[in-house]
Amino acid sequence: MLQTEMKVIQQTEIADKVYELILTGERVADMSPGQFLMLKPSRSDLLMRRPISICSYDKTAKTCILLYRIEGDGTRDFSKLSEGDTIDVLGPLGKGFDIDQTPAPKTALLIGGGIGVPPMYQLGKELAGKGVQVTFVNGFQSAKDSFYEKEMNAYGTVHIATVDGSLGTQGFVTDITNNFPEEPDVIYSCGPKAMLQAVKASFPETKTYLSLEERMACGIGACYACVCPKADDAKKQFKVCEDGPVFRADEVSL
């Protein structure tokens, strides 16, 4: 059973309503880039778990970092956790990013939007460790919403786009990527559906992997709450939590 208790090491608000939650537990040993955890709120009236992507992990220290934004009662409940508290966790879950491709890529473009930025961090770290030249492009609404630029700079070049122009390039992530002189060997992206659609349309010939953000209820493929149409047959569907959340761009219809 993937259900376990994890202990809170530290929690900090790092951007507007965005929290960095550091946990420790035995399940860290099983984590890979692009997976997620289903966290159970402590309030008895909040029955459903909430999916939170894994930002990073240290298997030696048995710690992992989750970044999440307060969106409702569940995530607001998580924001009250402090050092020494425990939380009921299901996971790690899902199929993450393919980082052992053949032939190995020389360059990788990692595109994250909003709360889709966190899983790009561990992915970029591991790709850089394999000798891949990593470029991060992160999109936010405003400077107050941005995070992890310094941390990502340790593993690659970081570009920032904000809708209001308060940090980096004004506009969207594609306003940056469309001006790159060369296409990368591989693209990985996570963020809102509109952003993923734009990324897919901008790089039709490049091997691209998309991590889908969908509302989930069970996290294990039992409830069919997070389905996505297949590209080759719209009548058939993937279960994002079980078959994904990461898919090749040509597999899914967005």
Curated annotation (Swiss-Prot):
Pathway recorded for this protein: Pyrimidine metabolism; UMP biosynthesis via de novo pathway; orotate from (S)-dihydroorotate (NAD(+) route): step 1/1
Any one biological process term the GO annotation gives: 'de novo' UMP biosynthetic process
Cofactor note: Binds 1 [2Fe-2S] cluster per subunit. Binds 1 FAD per subunit.
InterPro entries (UniProt xref): Cyt_c3_hydrogenase_gsu, Dihydroorotate_DH_ele_sf, Dihydroorotate_DH_Fe-S-bd, Dihydroorotate_DHASE_ETsu, FAD-bd_FR_type, FNR_nucleotide-bd, OxRdtase_FAD/NAD-bd, PyrK_electron_transfer
Family to which the UniProt record says this protein belongs: Belongs to the PyrK family.
Entry function: Responsible for channeling the electrons from the oxidation of dihydroorotate from the FMN redox center in the PyrD type B subunit to the ultimate electron acceptor NAD(+).
Protein name: Dihydroorotate dehydrogenase B (NAD(+)), electron transfer subunit
Gene field: pyrK
